[in-house]
């Protein structure tokens, strides 16, 4: 009985990571403060994120010996730390923080990436999100 009570308390105090599949309009609302940052418009961000993660915070992609996490597909070699490889951890954060529904830390790291690498860090941007962006606007905002 004591084990069950202990497990119940742990479950209440430490809930599971809450991942989220955003819609275009939900994500537009959350990311509105990124509009214009580094001269990147909100529709450019929405388009890029759609193509790299499908608006899904739990997206993990393994590529060339590294791993990319979350909506912004932030790489573990430079930007965040995990238990897989040695990382510079420039954003000073655990990679698993990019898998939850709190995008505050994701946006802070994405801005740092943009400042250091530019928008071309996200390959989908140049190929798919640099023109004809009307479809990425949310009329509900």
Swiss-Prot record:
Tell me which Gene Ontology terms the entry assigns under biological process. defense response to Gram-negative bacterium; defense response to Gram-positive bacterium; lactose biosynthetic process
What InterPro entries does the record tag this protein with? Glyco_hydro_22 (IPR001916), Glyco_hydro_22_CS (IPR019799), Lactalbumin (IPR000545), Lysozyme-like_dom_sf (IPR023346)
Q: Report the SUPFAM superfamilies cross-referenced here.
A: Lysozyme-like
Spell out the molecular function terms from Gene Ontology. Answer: calcium ion binding; lactose synthase activity; lysozyme activity
Which UniProt keywords are given for this protein, alphabetically ordered? Calcium, Disulfide bond, Lactose biosynthesis, Metal-binding, Milk protein, Secreted, Signal
Which cellular component terms (GO) are annotated to the entry? extracellular region; protein-containing complex
Q: Could you say which tissues express the protein in this record? A: Mammary gland specific. Secreted in milk.
- Main subcellular localization, coarse class? secreted
All copies of the C-type lysozyme domain together span 20-141
Binding residues for Ca(2+), per the UniProt record?
Answer: 97, 100, 102, 105-106
Signal peptide, first to last residue: 1-19
> According to its UniProt record, where is this protein located?
Secreted
Q: Which cysteines are joined by disulfide bonds?
A: 25-138, 47-129, 80-95, 91-109
**Entry's family note:** Belongs to the glycosyl hydrolase 22 family.
Q: What else is known?
A: The pig alpha-lactalbumin shows complete loss of both lysozyme functional residues.
Subunit record text: Lactose synthase (LS) is a heterodimer of a catalytic component, beta1,4-galactosyltransferase (beta4Gal-T1) and a regulatory component, alpha-lactalbumin (LA).
| Free-text function comment from the UniProt entry | Regulatory subunit of lactose synthase, changes the substrate specificity of galactosyltransferase in the mammary gland making glucose a good acceptor substrate for this enzyme. This enables LS to synthesize lactose, the major carbohydrate component of milk. In other tissues, galactosyltransferase transfers galactose onto the N-acetylglucosamine of the oligosaccharide chains in glycoproteins.
- What is the protein's given name? Alpha-lactalbumin
Q: What is the scientific name of the source organism? A: Sus scrofa (Pig)
**Gene behind this chain?**
LALBA
